[in-house]
Amino acid sequence: MEQLVRLGDVCTVVSGSTPKTSVDEYWNGDVKWITPAELDADSYYIHDSVKHITELGRTKTGLSYMPVGTVILSSRAPIGKTAILGCEMCCNQGFKNLICTDRIFNEYLYHFLRAKTNYLNSLGRGATFKELSKGIVENVLIPLPAIEEQHHIADLFASVEELIQTKKQQLDLFDELVKSRFIELFGDQETNPYNLNVGKLSDVAEIYLGLTHTPTYVEQGKPFLSVRDISSGVIDFSNCHYITEEEFCSLPNGARPRIGDMLFCRVGTIGKPVIIPENTPEFGTFVSVGYLRRKANVNNYYLKSWMENDFFMRQVYDNVAGASQINLNTGWLKNFRILIPSMEQQNQFATFVEQTDKSKLAVQQSITELEELKKSLMQKYFG
């Protein structure tokens, strides 16, 4: 069993701050200034920030430059986002910044913090929103093997992460391949170089919207999905709400999609179409989710790629110009322009997509296996 030490004994923990937004002279300078919103699940080394402040803003706010190699940890909701600074920069108050001594390797610390996201969240304090104080972070215990072993452990995680990122890039390439094939077969949706039939969305699909009021949620029952449950590009039942069988049966047709229908996000991340696959259990939908039920003159693969095409979003922006929040409204969605190729052409495209999806599935299975390996390594080294 490795010795456990306090983070405060092997790191200097420093908080960030925000210059006054009302003082223009503090902003749009050359000083990199990062916020937690800029980090995601794959963040590792960070070399730039979205916002920059001036040297005057930094000094007047009392901000210190965080040195290269500093491990940054988001300490406000969401707690637990982490990265390593690849260059000198400043941070806002949403971070606790850990400057490592020579007793701890920063990449080892990075992987430890990623493994402990749930634990760190449990340490959050606050009535309005949870936050990790400097003292809480300093008192977190970490296993501390010899520095050579820390490097070895970090290298193991880096190898697995590199494989995962390579596989994810392969998935992105498959998606780009489908987009390219779509353009190759059907041309640009706006200029229509192949003189395909032009129609409206209502010519090829019926449009439905989910339940407009919030139902009564229960612990078990029929799944009831909102936009968060499909925005990843797949149907995710892991954190969805449930309603009773009785309430499900009383839902209007618009809130009861069926296998083969195509779900889409109406708010937030617009579009993100998902075709409901075979063997999916029955579920209801909230108004943030809509769905298309195709007609005989279109197949779902073509319809899905049409919604993922840039021309679709251009039509969205044309209809919501000036709106503070984008909502897909059936009043104008039904009139969206869509090219209608022959079913022979559409089916040719569908065959290509099906073959690509098989390849994607194999890659996704590899990613799942690598993620499980990473979890086992986290358990082995960090408990």
Give residue ranges: language-model regions.
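Non-catalytic DNA-recognition/assembly elements of restriction-modification systems
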Residues: 1-17, 139-154, 166, 170-211, ...
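A short beta-sheet element
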Residues: 35-36, 50-114, 226, 246-248, ...
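Feature detects amphipathic, helix-rich regulatory segments
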Residues: 61-66, 72-73, 88, 134, ...
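Residue-level recognition of specific faces of alpha-helices
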Residues: 94, 128-131, 136, 156-159, ...
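Specificity-determining recognition surfaces
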Residues: 96, 114-142, 306-338
